Amino acid sequence: MAGPDSPQQQQVEEKAEQIDDAELAFQGINMLLNNGFRESDELFRRYRTHSPLMSFGASFVSFLNAMMTFEEEKMQMASDDLRTTEKLCESDNAGVIETIRNKIKKSMDSGRSGVEIVDRLQRQIIVADCQVYLAVLSFVKQELSAYIKGGWILRKAWKMYNKCYSDISQLQEACRRRSSDQQGALASDQANHNTSTGSGGRVTDEVLDRLKGSVSFGYGLFHLCISMVPPHLLKIVNLLGFPGDRHQGLASLAYASESKDMKAPLATLALLWYHTVVQPFFALDGSDSRAGLLEAKAILQKKAMVYPNSSLFIFFKGRVQRLECQINSALASFQDALEFASDQREIQHVCLYEIGWCSMIEMSFEDAFRSFERLKNESRWSQCYYAYLTGVCQGASGDLEGAKGVFRDVQKLFKRKNNQIEQFALKRAEKLRKVSLTRELCILGVVEVLYLWKALPNCSSSKLQLMNQVLQGLDDQSSIGLKHLLLGAIQKCLGNIKDALQSFQLAAQDEYGRLNNSYVQPYACYELGCVLLAKPETLSKGRSLLLQAKENYAGYDFENRLHVRIHSALASIKEVVPH
């Protein structure tokens, strides 16, 4: 942890008046990622009136703190900080929204310098970034009016990103032409694009590259997030004018991560988040949960010297190890990250969550119980969900009376009625509270969440065999369909495709599930479809089952989650067999 008088902080502060704000902001973000959250916050706040960029840095740290805590006071503070930064960026005049092209023309007419062009571009990008973060804070409230407001804020931000991205690209092209042509084209480019203003100064390639990196972070993240919107919501998204090109998003984030902009380290984290969390969870590359790991490992190796003890980078190293089924190594990494984050409670909670999951994967139920119980008691995010995980792990370890007590707590901790995870936790806890509880039913609950969160592929063959053995001996009639779905998923992970197909077919025929609108049937259809897609002779049948899962069921748990996976699977067919 970087201390208050650490050499790293002293070095940054000594340079504060000697270097430009772009470099100071870049170093401030690096300080944050090297476990210096408090020091980074202090640095940005000390210089927040120094420039729009430093003001944005202070507001970003405030936003990050709010998103890690979900505390109302911190979210309000972040909103106030972001609006203050917006006002600072718009303070010179109201023309921040005006097109850059007109500004360049005016700049030429009035003899303004190229430095002012850069300043105006930077301000526009910052305003767009602030708009996005304000929209996110609005979405967190989970109210209809907040969604509508957030959507329109994002629309405004997207237009600004798109315009800035286009104009910076044009300026870069003008610079390249100027460099390659030392005669007539040089004068023409300078006149048309004002990339040099004589005595006023020139917009250099280096400055434009940093600006391109700055806009590419928001531009890329926008593309990536919109590309993951459930298909049935895409019409609404398209009405707002948002695109959703995943490849463009990844390319833009990769560009941003290599730039000298302050958001370069954040773009790196966004790429790691996508490759190790989003991609395997939503099955964005078919059923291969290891897709993207090579990219993630390359990023971690490249940044190891820059962030040797960063709790966040060590956390993502643990995610890679978990996805590679190196669970003991993953546990060690998460434990290291937990210790390095000793001063940052929220990062500790993320690490504890992963330790709990790795323990479930290893069927070390007592260790999982301890992690989730601590989260239930300390975290302000979804104590209801953590209570359910605590209960099933406690029951799976053999403490059935303790588990019953925790399941009773789930009802008291249920707060967010529109949250599908809390709804699921409440329903499952109520069911387990009312039946004659057994260790096997609790293990069924553990295997179920491992399946729903795409963690079964991370389990070793020996643990999968043990899960299979427990489920085979379960005879609870209300859980028959779920039992067959999970047995099919286990057999699929073990490579026993014939047995997997048989179990998925039994799950798809589950009458109890149909009457209770369970997710079992649509998920079983999806699983059957994915297995059949693997062979050319059954591809058509597989596609038909995917469409059946998509169109014949509605209103079940985790519907949006399945729709994203179905959309990805259907898209993979189009790539192989283009229409």
UniProtKB/Swiss-Prot annotation:
Q: Which parts of this chain are annotated as the region Disordered? A: 182-202
Question: Which residue ranges contain the repeat TPR?
Answer: 311-344, 349-382, 481-514
Which GO BP annotation is one of this protein's?
Answer: cilium assembly
Arranged from A to Z, the UniProt key words for this protein are: Repeat, TPR repeat
Q: Which residues cross the membrane?
A: none
Give the InterPro entries listed for this entry.
Iml2/TPR_39 (IPR019412), TPR-like_helical_dom_sf (IPR011990)
The annotated regions of Polar residues compositional bias extend over 182-197
Q: Which family does it belong to?
A: Belongs to the TTC39 family.
What is the recorded name of this protein?
Tetratricopeptide repeat protein 39C
Q: Which organism is it from?
A: Danio rerio
Which gene carries the instructions for this protein? ttc39c
